[in-house]
């Protein structure tokens, strides 16, 4: 693991150096092209040694920049392919590691064993139901409350009920007892009879 980390650091360092070198070469090429354009604007002859030197260097850097751009494109394409391949390999490795913990589910006899155990459980449940039905015939039946217990239970329930504060039914004299209809008002004679 440590060696892998060292290799990764070296690779990243080399990439930084290469990128820095390409940048410097591009700056140099741009400087040579600017010099050529400046001398051209100043009317320097193309056969002048300084012009020829700057033009040659600018051309070399231009060609090198094109090649570097093509290489960079290929490198980017290769790195993308490597990244996809690495992702697929890592995914397959993770899947294999996950399935390794459930190898018994993948064995050829797993389904047969599972079916046999399921049948055995079903048979055991049937046997248990038969045993319960057989034993229930020998269990004593539940005893109900006799009449005296029922009366006692009702009395306790009535004693525990709250006492109402006032009766919901308002009593009044009927016409048969007082001679007055509950819907007709009392006359003077009726009131006198009531007071007596």
Swiss-Prot record:
<keyword id="KW-0946">Virion</keyword>
<feature type="compositionally biased region" description="Polar residues">
    <location>
        <begin position="175"/>
        <end position="196"/>
    </location>
</feature>
<comment type="similarity">
    <text>Belongs to the alphaherpesvirinae HHV-1 UL14 protein family.</text>
</comment>
<dbReference type="GO" id="GO:0042025">
    <property type="term" value="C:host cell nucleus"/>
</dbReference>
<protein>
    <recommendedName>
        <fullName>Tegument protein UL14</fullName>
    </recommendedName>
</protein>
<dbReference type="GO" id="GO:0019033">
    <property type="term" value="C:viral tegument"/>
</dbReference>
<keyword id="KW-1048">Host nucleus</keyword>
<keyword id="KW-1035">Host cytoplasm</keyword>
<dbReference type="Pfam" id="PF03580">
    <property type="entry name" value="Herpes_UL14"/>
</dbReference>
<dbReference type="InterPro" id="IPR005207">
    <property type="entry name" value="Herpes_UL14"/>
</dbReference>
<feature type="region of interest" description="Disordered">
    <location>
        <begin position="162"/>
        <end position="196"/>
    </location>
</feature>
<dbReference type="GO" id="GO:0030430">
    <property type="term" value="C:host cell cytoplasm"/>
</dbReference>
<keyword id="KW-0920">Virion tegument</keyword>
